[in-house]
Amino acid sequence: MTTDLKKTPLYQNYVDSGAKIVEFGGWAMPVQFSSIKEEHNAVRYNVGLFDVSHMGEIEISGKDAEQFIQYILSNDTNLLTNDKAMYSALCNDEGGIIDDLVTYKLNENHYLLIVNAANTNKDYQWIKKHSSNFTVDVSNTSDKYGQLAIQGPHSRALINELVDIDVSHMAMFEFKQNVQIFGKSIILSQSGYTGEDGFEIYCKQEDTKDIWEQLLEYDVTPCGLGARDTLRLEAGLPLHGQDLSESITPYEGGIAFAAKPLIENHFIGKSVLKAQKENGSERRTVGLELLGKGIARTGYDVLDENSNEIGFVTSGTQSPSSGKSIALAIIDRDAFEMGKKVIVQIRKRQVEAKIVKKNQIEK
């Protein structure tokens, strides 16, 4: 592994625990601590803890911040409040997804954007470039934050014990600022990337190690990127760079709920997304379950029963929960029918599959 990879504040903890470390988005990250299946099941049935400090943070502040946020994001940012976050897309003029991200409104003129690690610098430069006509300050503050995700059906009860507020009724994407945990001040968000109940903790970078170590004193399993990927794929949640890209729109990528092109305010990519909203997109994302042996890898062709190409696999794995071979794929809209049999071209073999719901969590 090259030595110029970025490291989170927990890198030495990975090394000391014997975690398997890999390169991901320019970072040295743990792919697993024990086994992917063990970590996956900990999140599905108990509590797992992820270091996601590699994610990027971009802050936008100033008199025109509210107006600018709507200009660059595809969702209706008028619905943002000081305690409610929002999932959205940063789109180009063609409606393609530069990145998918979560936005926190810290106050009337101050927003925090959480972006994908590999896209942080690209996003920052793009946002900065488009800010010239607005009175805003755009800052890449990724070095300021640590981020941990505590996920699983028992995570809420545990967090409720450890923080100074009642989280028992916190709804999805609700967040609170200046929450205390282990004597540290954090932003606590009811969110995650696993398909389970859970929370994300944003802390000062220098507090990350202490919070991580104290959380692990409870019945919590440290988890790596391997389980994060199988969990999100079972839940049908997209990964930018595979399921989403600059040539895939929110309507094609299965995140139509994050696009609101019928709102009055203009945003970049709105005209293309409005046409897709009104007329339908030519492609759509589906779930696949393979009926034969093999894993559907990113880029494999999807064919109809007459061997005509109708799309391609964006992500695939063997589900640790069900043992089934599952995938996400983008196919032609006209080829879609729930339960329909299709073929995945796995190297020289053709493997039968069927179209299913994107969320394939089985317990």
Swiss-Prot record:
Q: One GO term of the cellular component aspect?
A: cytosol
| Reaction(s) catalysed by this chain's protein | N(6)-[(R)-S(8)-aminomethyldihydrolipoyl]-L-lysyl-[protein] + (6S)-5,6,7,8-tetrahydrofolate = N(6)-[(R)-dihydrolipoyl]-L-lysyl-[protein] + (6R)-5,10-methylene-5,6,7,8-tetrahydrofolate + NH4(+)
The entry lists its GO molecular-function terms as: aminomethyltransferase activity; transaminase activity
**SUPFAM superfamilies referenced in this protein's UniProt entry, alphabetically:** Aminomethyltransferase beta-barrel domain, Folate-binding domain
Could you list this entry's UniProt keywords, alphabetically sorted.
Answer: Aminotransferase, Transferase
Might you give the EC number(s) for this enzyme? 2.1.2.10
Note the Pfam families from the entry.
GCV_T, GCV_T_C
The Gene Ontology biological process annotation of the record reads: glycine decarboxylation via glycine cleavage system
Task: Please state which protein family the record places this protein in.
Answer: Belongs to the GcvT family.
Q: Give the record's subunit note.
A: The glycine cleavage system is composed of four proteins: P, T, L and H.
Q: What does this protein do?
A: The glycine cleavage system catalyzes the degradation of glycine.
- What name does UniProt use for this protein? Aminomethyltransferase
Q: What is the lineage of its organism?
A: Bacteria, Bacillati, Bacillota, Bacilli, Bacillales
Query: Which gene produces this protein?
Result: gcvT
